[in-house]
Structures are given as C-alpha cells and as structure tokens.
C-alpha cells in the first residue's frame, strides 16, 4: 500500500484572517455621518433612508441620527437612519 502517512503537520496550518463582519451599531443607537452600521458579505441588510452602501456592501450613515432596523419583506431587513429630535 503506497500511502503517505505522517505528513499532517507540514500540510496543515492554513487559516484565513478574521474579517470582523456584523452589526456595528444597533437599533436605537445614535450615529454620525460616515459611521459604519453593518459590515457584511452581500446584501444581507438592504440600505434604507439616509444610509449609503459601500463597494464591499458596508452600510454607513449619511446623516446625524438614530439607527433603525426595519423588516422590509418576509426575509429582508432594511437599515435606515432617521434624524434625532
């Protein structure tokens, strides 16, 4: 049987760096323009009012205000920022 054995340690050892994805500012939190609200892969959250969508699908605030997460459809969430009173 010509099987290679015992070379596991030299062939293992690959792992990607963490990407720090996820929600950075939650509903009800105050944000300023340019603050990142969500970092994501693809549009898990869709942009709503007063937010921008970056090239890597990062959602960020365009105005001073409060973050809200709204149910857009059955399986879609929308992130908006509304001006604080």
From Swiss-Prot:
Molecular function GO labels: structural constituent of ribosome
InterPro entries in the record: Ribosomal_bL27, Ribosomal_bL27_CS
Pfam families in UniProt: Ribosomal_L27
GO BP of this protein: translation
Region ranges (Disordered): 1-25
Entry similarity comment: Belongs to the bacterial ribosomal protein bL27 family.
Record protein name field: Large ribosomal subunit protein bL27
Encoding gene per record: rpmA
């Amino acid at each position: 049987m010509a099987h290679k054995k015992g070379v596991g340690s030299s062939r293992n050892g690959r792992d990607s760096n963490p990407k720090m994805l996820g929600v950075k500012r939650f509903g009800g939190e105050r944000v300023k323009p340019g603050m990142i609200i969500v970092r994501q892969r693809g549009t898990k959250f869709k942009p709503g009012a007063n937010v921008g969508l970056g090239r890597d699908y990062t959602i960020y605030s365009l105005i001073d205000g409060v973050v809200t997460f709204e149910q857009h459809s059955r399986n879609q969430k929308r992130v908006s920022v509304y001006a604080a009173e």
